[in-house]
Every structure is written in structure tokens, then in C-alpha cells.
């Protein structure tokens, strides 16, 4: 216990290890539950694809996969919104200003709940128009629209769960989100099997199973986080417009970056769709696999952000570069693992999604795309770590520019070359975009490292 600036007693948080332990140890302890959580998040997402592909067929798999690029846009709005709140929560937590921290939490939950309902209504209302605009093949359009509409009914649950997960990690707690993800992933798989294989509900059953699992997970997350916040007795405001403005200054560039990249992937999806249902099935299968491995590196980047922000808030400037270097070490280790797994098991991994119904074209597209990514995941790793440091420091403009460069390379090659020279050009430019992103971010970071006189928020 200790006395606070408000004259109240406050607990010493066990989650302050990010500002006390050795950087590599602290990041490893913090990141590993996030990495495991990312794995279960993808198990959660892939359950629909695997079960639909195995029990309904490759056309149904293509319908679910065709929704992925669009749903990612809306997910990225949630993730980007969480960044703005998370950076400030971490910094106030590091500075031990728990009243401001709780004000940020309350303000963000109220604001983003309203936003999630608005986006859910919009997405449900325009599902058919959006899928038609993506040139979704006619034979899978109805299933894709059905899946998407059920998804948007549950969107507020997904949105709030992602915001709450960011809040947990911002205070150095990565184990609770992991436990909730494991629970919801297992629940989602059982419900998928029951509704798709047992009841024969097809893509509707897969979407409904996901909605129910997300809803239960979001409710549990809220109740647990509410309990945690009550341990900090400092007074706070339920809603603060000035703090909302501070969040938005960080969140808006992140939302723009993540949403624009996802919109770019929607455009890439539109490039892939004319190649036919089987090519789309192979592409969708590897997109799921890419998400599994990429979220490992995303998790490390997400772990380094609160590490940087908490240490900046605590004025421990000497620990910032050490944390960045520790993140790069973790990225290298996982890049080697990803390469080994993909190079050895790419055919078996593809078969999980495509099953016996997949054609030679679907397997070729999936295998070629997957192996190419395996060679260059290290570029994604160093990009994510550098971006994570920029976010933790609140340096958002170079972060946004770097990611736009990445997107421009991927889009230009896909749009100009794929229709003329073949579908392979959809993925050939991916590592070049990652590398360019890293170089721009790193150049900005070298100019922006805080000095010992950097101020923490009060």
C-alpha cells in the first residue's frame, strides 16, 4: 500500500514488472501470453473456415473467406481505437496516476460502445452492396452476405472485447485475455461443429457460433476488468472530453492506418476474385495461415508499445532502446520457427482448409503464397517492433506514412501486374512492402528517441 496524491491508499500493482524487470525477460513474460492469445484468436477465426471447408465444401469456404477482407476493415477500427486509449492508459499507469488512467478507461468504453453500434448497423444494412462491390463470385454471394450480416449483429461484442483486451495489456496484464480467448475458442469450435456438422446450418451456423462465443467472452472481459479497476481507489471522471480528444489524436492515425490497409486488402481481394472460386479458396486458406503467423509479430509489436509507454511515463528513458532490441530478438526467433513450419508442412496446412474438395489450382495458389511468405516473415517482425515503439512514444504521423508506403507497394503491384501476368503478383510484393515500411519507421525512430528530460503525463 502507498499514499497517493489524493490522500488515499493505493495497492502496489504486481503488473509493474514492465518498468522493473530486465527488458528481455519483461517482454518475453508479457508477450508470450499475447502470442498464445493470438494463436487462439486465429483458432477462433479459423474454426469457421476449417469446419465449413470440411463439412460444407470449398464454395462455402470461399464465401467465408470472401468476407475476411471486409470484416478486417471493421476489426481494424476497433484495434485502432484501442491504440489511442491503450497508449494513454499505459503512460498514466507507469506514472502511477490512476485517476487519469480510470478516466481514460471509462471515456473510451462509453465512446467506443456507441461507435460499435453505429458501425454494426451500417455493416448489416450494406452487406450486399459491399460484397457485390468486391466482385464476389455469383455462386457464393448469398452465403457471403448471410455470413456477413450475422457477423455485424455481433460486432459490438467483438469491438468491446478488443478494446478491453487492449486495456488489460496496457496495465501489463496479458494472462486474462489469454484465458478468455482459450475459453471462447473452445466454445466456438464446439458450437461450430454442432451447428455446421450436426444441425447442417452451413455458413449461417458458423457465423452464429462465432457471435455467441464473442458475446460471452466480451461480457466476461467487462466484468473482470471492472473488478480490476475497483482495486485502484483514485477518483475519476466517467467521461472527459479533453481526454477523449487526447485519445483521438493517437487513435485516429492508427484507425486510418489499419483501416486503409484493410481497405487495400479488400481491393486485393477484388483482384483475386475474377480468378475464380478455386483460386479464391486457395488464397483465402493462406490468408488464414498468414494471419496466424503475422499475429505473432503483431503481438510482439503490441507488447512493446505498453512497455515503451509505461517506461516513458515512469521516466525510465534508459530502458526504451533495450526494450526495442529485446523485441527484435523475439521477432528473429519466431521468424525462424515460422519458416521451418511452413517449409515442412505447407501442403498439410493447406489441406486443413481445402480438404478433398480442393482442386489442384486451389492447392497450388495456397502453397505458393504460403512458402513465399515463410521466407520473409522477418521483415514483418522488424516492421511490427518498430511500429510498436512509435505507437508507444505516441509518434503517429511517421507510423501512418510508413504503413501507407507498405500499402502503396502491395496495391500497385497487385493492380498493375496480377491481371496481366497472373495471381502470383498478388503476394510477390508483400515482403517488399514490409521492408519499405520498416525503413521509413526506423528512420523516424532514430530522430525521435526521447531524452532523459522527456516528460511523463501528470
Regions found by a protein language model. Give the residues of each.
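Short alpha-helical transmembrane segments in multi-pass integral membrane proteins
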Residues: 1-31, 89-154, 198-252, 308-375, ...
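Residue-level signal for short hydrophobic patches within transmembrane helices
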Residues: 20, 24-43, 47, 70-77, ...
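Interfacial/gating helices of multi-pass transporter permease domains
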Residues: 29, 52-72, 138-143, 203-204, ...
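Transmembrane helical elements of multi-pass membrane transporters/channels
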Residues: 29-48, 150, 184, 213-217, ...
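Helix-terminus/linker motif at the lipid-water interface of multi-pass membrane proteins
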Residues: 39, 43-61, 131-138, 194-201, ...
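Small-residue-rich hydrophobic transmembrane alpha-helices
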Residues: 61-121, 158-177, 282-346, 380-394, ...
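Hydrophobic transmembrane alpha-helices of multi-pass small-molecule transporters
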Residues: 73-76, 188-192, 217-222, 292-295, ...
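Short runs within selected transmembrane alpha-helices of multi-pass transporters and secretion channels
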Residues: 82, 151-169, 177-185, 206-219, ...
Amino acid at each position: 500500500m502507498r499514499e497517493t496524491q489524493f490522500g488515499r491508499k493505493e495497492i502496489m500493482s504486481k503488473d509493474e514488472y514492465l518498468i522493473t524487470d530486465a527488458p528481455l525477460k519483461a517482454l518475453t513474460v508479457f508477450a508470450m501470453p499475447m502470442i498464445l492469445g493470438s494463436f487462439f484468436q486465429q483458432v477462433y477465426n479459423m474454426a469457421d473456415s476449417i469446419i465449413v471447408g470440411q463439412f460444407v465444401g470449398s464454395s462455402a469456404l470461399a464465401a467465408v473467406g470472401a468476407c475476411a477482407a471486409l470484416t478486417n476493415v471493421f476489426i481494424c477500427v476497433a484495434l485502432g481505437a484501442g491504440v489511442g486509449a491503450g497508449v494513454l492508459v499505459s503512460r498514466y499507469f507507469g506514472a502511477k496516476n490512476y485517476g487519469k488512467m480510470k478516466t481514460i478507461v471509462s471515456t473510451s468504453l462509453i465512446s467506443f460502445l456507441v461507435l460499435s453500434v453505429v458501425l454494426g448497423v451500417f455493416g448489416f444494412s450494406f452487406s450486399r452492396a459491399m460484397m457485390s462491390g468486391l466482385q464476389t463470385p455469383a455462386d457464393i454471394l448469398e452465403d457471403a452476405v448471410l455470413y456477413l450480416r450475422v457477423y455485424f449483429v455481433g460486432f459490438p461484442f467483438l469491438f468491446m472485447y478488443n478494446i478491453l483486451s487492449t486495456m488489460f495489456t496496457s496495465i501489463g496484464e496479458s494472462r486474462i485475455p489469454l484465458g478468455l480467448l482459450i475459453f471462447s475458442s473452445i466454445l466456438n469450435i464446439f458450437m461450430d461443429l454442432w451447428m455446421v456438422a450436426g444441425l447442417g446450418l452451413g455458413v449461417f451456423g458458423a457465423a452464429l457460433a462465432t457471435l455467441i462465443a464473442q458475446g460471452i467472452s466480451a461480457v466476461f472481459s467487462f466484468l473482470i476488468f471492472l473488478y480490476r479497476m475497483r482495486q485502484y481507489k483514485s477518483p475519476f471522471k466517467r467521461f472527459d472530453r479533453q481526454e477523449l480528444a487526447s485519445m483521438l489524436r493517437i487513435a485516429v492515425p492508427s484507425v486510418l492506418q489499419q483501416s486503409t490497409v484493410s481497405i487495400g486488402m479488400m481491393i486485393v481481394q477484388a483482384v483475386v476474385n475474377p480468378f475464380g472460386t478455386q483460386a479464391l479458396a486457395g488464397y483465402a486458406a493462406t490468408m488464414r495461415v498468414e494471419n496466424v503467423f503475422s499475429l505473432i509479430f503483431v503481438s510482439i509489436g503490441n507488447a512493446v508499445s505498453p512497455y515503451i509507454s509505461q517506461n516513458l511515463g515512469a521516466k525510465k528513458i534508459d530502458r526504451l532502446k533495450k526494450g526495442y532490441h529485446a523485441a527484435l530478438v523475439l521477432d528473429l526467433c519466431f521468424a525462424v520457427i515460422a519458416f521451418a513450419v511452413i517449409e515442412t508442412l505447407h501442403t498439410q496446412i493447406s489441406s486443413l482448409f481445402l480438404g478433398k474438395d480442393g482442386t489442384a489450382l486451389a492447392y497450388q495458389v495456397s502453397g505458393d503464397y504460403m512458402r513465399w511468405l515463410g521466407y520473409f516473415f522477418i521483415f514483418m517482425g522488424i516492421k511490427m517492433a518498430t511500429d510498436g515503439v512509435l505507437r508507444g512514444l505516441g509518434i503517429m504521423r511517421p507510423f501512418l506514412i510508413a504503413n501507407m508506403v507498405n500499402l502503396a507497394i502491395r496495391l500497385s503491384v497487385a493492380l498493375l501486374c496480377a491481371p496481366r501476368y497472373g495471381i502470383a503478383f498478388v503476394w510477390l510484393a508483400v515482403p517488399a512492402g514490409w521492408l519499405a515500411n520498416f525503413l521509413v519507421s526506423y528512420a523516424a525512430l532514430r530522430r525521435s528517441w526521447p531524452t532523459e528530460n522527456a516528460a511523463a503525463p501528470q
